[in-house]
Amino acid sequence: MKGEILASIVAMSAILGTSSLACTTILVGDKASNDGSMLVARSADSKAIKAQVFLIHPAMKNQTGMHSSKAHDGANDFTYPLPKDGMRYTTIANSHTKLHGAVGYNEAGVGLSGTETIYAKDELLKIDPYNEETGITEDDIPDVLLPRMKSAKEGVKLLGEIVETKGAGEGFGVVFIDANELWYFETGTGHKWIASKIPQDEYFVTANQGRLHAYKENDPNFMGAKDVIKFAIDNKTYDPAKDGEFNFTKAYTRDDERDVTYNYPRVCWVQSMFNPSLKQDFADGQKFPVFLKPEKKLSVEDLKAAMRAHYDGTAFDNYASKDEDKKNIYRAISVFRTYESHVMQVRPWLPKEIGRVTYVALGMADLSVYLPYYEGLDGFIKGYSDGSYDADDTSIYWVYRKLQTLVMTDYEKYSPVVKEAYAKFEKELAVKQAKFEDEYVKLYKKDKKKADKLLNEFSKKTMQEAKDLTQELTNKVFTMLTADMDAKLKSLNKGKKD
């Protein structure tokens, strides 16, 4: 029996855990949210075994030398000078390299989420290729920028300078957020890029494709490489006389049949969630609005729901649909190979220790639980800094991933058990969290040290409770799976007694 169970799990993992890189990103302006906060959601998708670790990088003084990707077994041989005085910052990083921090804040309250893998036109990459050997990639962006950037705009400017001088090692989109502004950065080719400030009363969604259209030189709402428009004109991907206003996506971004089934549907689905009256077809990706005012103000819960989406309730549902012809046509947001997803929330009116919070779900969001990780945290419970690409009994990543792998052997039967338990946990946690934050603010005004102690006690208790629940659910699902396997093997025995 044990052999059949393991074989089933391995086969399912092979099917669901492909190596394709993909992410989905959502940004929400403060006047588009229900409480005046700025919100960022992103899924990080690659390999299901890509265990993550939670890191707190201490402030550093009088540094010399270089940051080296190669020294950490990173993507290439990118190097960059270390800042003389580096700020404290956090990342959720690759367990193997301790690089590729998916999300984090620094002590100045500036946050970053990256990257969104995007693709440029082949004809332009032949002229201005990615610098794959020594250009900057998602492996190094957080560890270069977070210790030194004091605002979102400064982060955009610095990354742009690096792309223009050292080159991008790949195509990417990056989110920058601070107390006042929310920016999205996209590469075009190896040395071309633009960035746009997100309108306060609108939201933006992207899925593995360049999505920024407008770009205006000398406009404070935009930044970009100095010759980004001229390069497109010179290489005949933009003709002002014929095309009218410059469109960065149209000029620089790959757009073909792959995007129709892989990328467009995710953008369309999120926009339909937040703007139900909007009527558009999955295939009309180039017509989707870039920025939209939501029909109702958006919350953290709305973004969690988007990160968990898989065309729920339709024939295209990747996991629950009975229509085998339509079930896997379109790529869902929540996929098994997601190794983490997060929702960043910035509330400038609160002390930054709790005003900057990231809700993180490890593994597949649809079968995981979102926990709040405050910027004021000084540590984690055991297992958060452990992990590798091999399953173990210590890593917090594998606590969640083991349960998800079991559930995917029979999603229809086992997923309701997990989803109902996690929904109940999150609902109860929201009540506890509101009470904690109220207590924290009152205590912060009198005694910051005691307030920070309260923050860490609450956070670590939450981590432990979620871990305990997950282990209970793993045992419950494993018991169900064992009983199912027993029944299956007995039926194969044609009613004969063992």
Residue ranges and their predicted role:
Residues 8-17:
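Bacterial N-terminal signal peptides
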Residues 18-22:
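Sec/Tat signal peptide C-region and signal peptidase I cleavage site
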Residues 23-138, 158-285, 289, 294-295:
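A contiguous strand-loop segment
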Residues 260-327, 331-336, 425-445:
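Accessory, solvent-exposed terminal regions and/or long lumenal/extracellular loops of proteins
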Residues 316-445:
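Substrate-recognition/cap regions that form aromatic- and gly/pro-loop-enriched pockets
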Residues 418-498:
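Histidine-centered catalytic/metal-binding microenvironments
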